[in-house]
């Protein structure tokens, strides 16, 4: 019996920042000294971000975003201030649009929810206030000083709800951070596949849904 839920936030409860990141990548590609595509900038930015986030010293998400973008800008010869370019992304984190189905789901769910999000606490608090959202518990990467898939994130969430791994589902859109992160902690994972991707063979998912309304029957 499911007694609680762990929910990713960006890409699960609210829309992810893909569009904003693509716009930033477009600007970097347009201003680069060499001919590069948006896709090249996006791939490089993602790679550098993951390297910074996985480093030995914890960095806030805002720092990770700016530091990794600065590295990519230097690589392609793009002059400018990464903080200025990232400003739109930071604003987005504080007022993202709600994902389809979220309001309907939240109006029907009865089990306690802990949000588990790779984001700075102030940005998440502002985003939740923007939409008038409240949950039983909230765990951010800044609170734990670690990012998913680190087990510490999931352990903190379970402790916050006072539930065991076999009593909850973790729900998120990231295969690496959410699905494999939860699986490594012994928590069944539900994948939010809002991009219409093919589920890789052997992926440890308890269920695949497109939005949170798909959870209603799963936890009934």
Where in the sequence are the language-model features?
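Asp-based, Mg2+/Mn2+-dependent phosphohydrolase catalytic module
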Residues: 1-5, 80, 103, 107, ...
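N-terminal helical cap/lid subdomain that shapes the substrate entry/recognition surface
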Residues: 2-103, 120-122
